């Protein structure tokens, strides 16, 4: 099994990011991105990388979803009541989408990988533009460009085992939340939600 995403793929995403950035320049726009993270430190690390990719596309970070042109919801499948809380939060963005039809909303992370979640979003949450599994975070520029150009919804969710593609993307920019610390991944993910197999995902309270 190939572990790493090929460098050609990450270079492709950088090129797409450049195209998006040029589009914003022509339109004289300074779009904003807002991210909401649920779950463990790995999710926080993933969000930093997705924000880094968004900035590479020409977005600037905002702390207010009402001002955002791009909203990233990075979800957790382990924490108690995660699904209920996540969908409750995501539901609040429906009004923002009605007010700004150009707003792009991405549903990312571990919950996106769960069986039935993509179908649930397709059926009940039409204002969500893309469902992005953890293996596709590095494709954020491509996903954004696809939504901008076609306004078609996308579902990038892969099933374990990962046999035909890499699961770790290197050389991805990150927007650090702290000047004094950075996350270092020592493992990636989990394919079993039972308590006995997810102790490594438990964080200090």
Locations of regions flagged by a protein language model:
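Proteins enriched for Cys/Gly/acidic motifs involved in redox and nucleic-acid/cofactor modification
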Residues: 1-199
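Short "domain-exit" segments at the C-terminal end of structured domains
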Residues: 200-205
């Amino acid at each position: 099994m190939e572990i790493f995403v090929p460098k050609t793929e990450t270079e492709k995403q950088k090129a797409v990011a450049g195209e998006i950035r040029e589009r914003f320049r022509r339109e004289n726009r300074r779009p904003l991105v807002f991210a909401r993270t649920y779950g463990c430190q790995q999710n926080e690390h993933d969000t930093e990388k997705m924000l880094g990719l968004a900035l590479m596309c020409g977005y600037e970070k905002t702390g207010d979803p009402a001002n955002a042109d791009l909203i990233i919801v990075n979800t957790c499948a382990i924490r108690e009541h995660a699904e209920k809380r996540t969908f409750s939060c995501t539901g609040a963005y429906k009004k923002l989408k009605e007010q700004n039809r150009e707003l792009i909303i991405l549903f990312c992370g571990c919950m996106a990988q769960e069986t039935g979640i993509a179908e649930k979003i397709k059926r009940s949450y039409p204002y969500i533009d893309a469902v992005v599994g953890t293996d596709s975070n590095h494709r954020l520029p491509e996903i954004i460009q696809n939504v901008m150009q076609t306004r078609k919804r996308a579902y990038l969710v892969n099933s374990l085992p990962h046999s035909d593609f890499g699961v770790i993307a290197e050389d991805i920019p990150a927007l650090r939340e702290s000047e004094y610390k950075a996350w270092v991944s020592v493992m990636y993910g989990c394919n079993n939600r039972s308590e006995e197999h997810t102790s490594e995902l438990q964080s200090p309270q």
